[in-house]
């Protein structure tokens, strides 16, 4: 299997690449691309880690070489959040980056599964879909918005609150990947009861966790390490699926459109990518209210992406 990371020299890209170098199955190839001149050095640095994963770095003129033969393409490229910015402020800078990189995917590895990490994911995934449609190679089973960070944060925060091992906590997170569009289904956490206030506080913390990190880093970065871990978890689950070992992850995909054209919910990953979009079950009254209040915003984010790509 060949995995390409586009934007591999950034904070997320380096963390993700390190995790993939240490966790991809033996015999895998890891292809690192970035416009930053440091990327060949990142590849050399990682090549000194003794795992049977071949790492190659590609500079800004070598996108085609980086992509050819890729099974999975992960795109964390773009400008990170700074204090005072929200994910939508990133749109003007990052939309064009995603559009160009996905065009590269269409030209060089049109059958690859693509995981979009670049924010705002609510909008960049629809942009990617439109680019792939125009190129005649769009398969909705193979395009994903990586929302796993919301899931791992939910698991960590629930574990912290209840003194549980977070590795044993499972929290489905549905909707989108910014602000109130992030909807953790805390009513579905097995074996744990929350008060109404705890649910409100936890939901708010999960929705604003990115800001918590940006402010804590005081201008020195955004959530790069946790996002790297989240992206690696998603990529490794997807890889297992492609190899015939079905896995389930929450991810932002084009679905039946019951709520919005693109929507994050549990998905069964298999040999063709998104094999089946699973039901997220019954919502509590609080969750349903949150859903009703956020859908218009999510639909607006999606339309912004479609309009940009057109």
From Swiss-Prot:
What interactions and quaternary structure are annotated? Homodimer.
Q: So where's the catalytic machinery, residue-wise?
A: 177 (proton acceptor)
| Tagged with keyword rRNA-binding | no
Keywords, ordered alphabetically: NAD, Oxidoreductase, Tricarboxylic acid cycle
Q: Which enzyme type, at the first EC level? A: oxidoreductase
- InterPro entries given in the database record: L-lactate/malate_DH, Lactate/malate_DH_C, Lactate/malate_DH_N, Lactate_DH/Glyco_Ohase_4_C, Malate_DH_AS, Malate_DH_type1, Malate_DH_type1_bac, NAD(P)-bd_dom_sf
State whether keyword NAD applies. yes
Role summary: Catalyzes the reversible oxidation of malate to oxaloacetate.
- Tell me what gene encodes this: mdh
Which PROSITE patterns does this one have?
MDH (PS00068)
The family database entries (Gene3D superfamilies) matched by this protein are listed as: Lactate dehydrogenase/glycoside hydrolase, family 4, C-terminal, NAD(P)-binding Rossmann-like Domain
- GO BP term, example: malate metabolic process
* One Gene Ontology MF term: L-malate dehydrogenase (NAD+) activity
- Name of the protein in question: Malate dehydrogenase
Supply the HAMAP family for this chain. Malate_dehydrog_1
List the GO cellular component terms. Answer: cytoplasm
Q: Could you say which EC number(s) this protein's record lists?
A: 1.1.1.37
